[in-house]
A protein has these predicted regions:
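Glycine/tyrosine- and acidic-biased, solvent-exposed loop/turn segments at the edges of beta-strands
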Residues: 1-209
Length: 209
């Protein structure tokens, strides 16, 4: 690349090109470091990145593109991801909403497919921590899990389409506790013994089928 180093250039607005003259970046500098807007281009001349810098560090909104399509938006503070971030699919539909604190995922993230919410997940310090829920495209809850520092912790439940619990598994910091419990669509535990003759007679007297 024929462009001289930033520290040797006094201008604040620059075009960086390769040896063939193709434009790679439009940048702003102050005292030889990136400061202000940056725009990067692919071989077709399309924008692949827009970002803001302060004293050589990303600071403000960054956007990433695939051709003319926006792929991601993310906020930065002093070089670290901070605040909301969004991802988009090839059709421009939102696929994820996340939040960052000091460069780590924090709080609730939401994930989408075909415009529908399919997962919510909670993070602490970049690790799964708290409840994660998965949904079908019809909005029905499919599974609810719980995490502590990226390890399964607590009860994991899977559901039938009618909302009844299909399966229950308990965990303690990633280790399964006890047996996997299965249930039919009426909520009855599979493998559970039927009622004794006396109990069945009492059920019939109460009018229970």
């Amino acid at each position: 690349m024929s462009t001289p180093p930033l520290s040797a250039i006094s201008q604040s607005l620059l075009e960086l090109r390769d040896d063939s003259g193709r434009l790679l970046h439009n940048i702003s500098t102050r005292q030889g470091v990136l400061h202000g807007a940056l725009q990067s281009f692919n071989v077709a001349g399309q924008t692949v990145q827009r970002a803001a810098y302060q004293n050589g560090m990303r600071h403000g909104l960054s956007e990433y593109y695939d051709g003319s399509r926006l792929q991601m938006q993310q906020q930065f503070v002093k070089g670290l991801a901070q605040g909301p971030a969004k991802l988009f699919d090839a059709a421009g539909n939102l696929t994820a909403e996340m939040n960052y604190v000091a460069g780590q995922l924090e709080g609730e993230s939401r994930y989408y497919a075909q415009g529908r919410l399919v997962r919510t997940a909670n993070y602490r310090g970049g690790k799964l921590h708290g409840v994660v829920e998965d949904f079908g495209l019809d909005g029905a809850l499919l599974q609810r899990t719980s995490y502590q520092a990226n390890a399964l912790h607590g009860t994991t439940l899977r559901y039938w389409p009618n909302g009844q619990v299909m399966q229950r598994v308990d965990y303690d910091l990633g280790l399964m506790q006890g047996a996997v419990r299965q249930f039919d669509q009426a909520g009855k535990a599979l493998g559970e013994p039927g009622p004794t003759l006396v109990k069945r007679f009492e059920q019939l007297l109460r009018g229970q089928p």
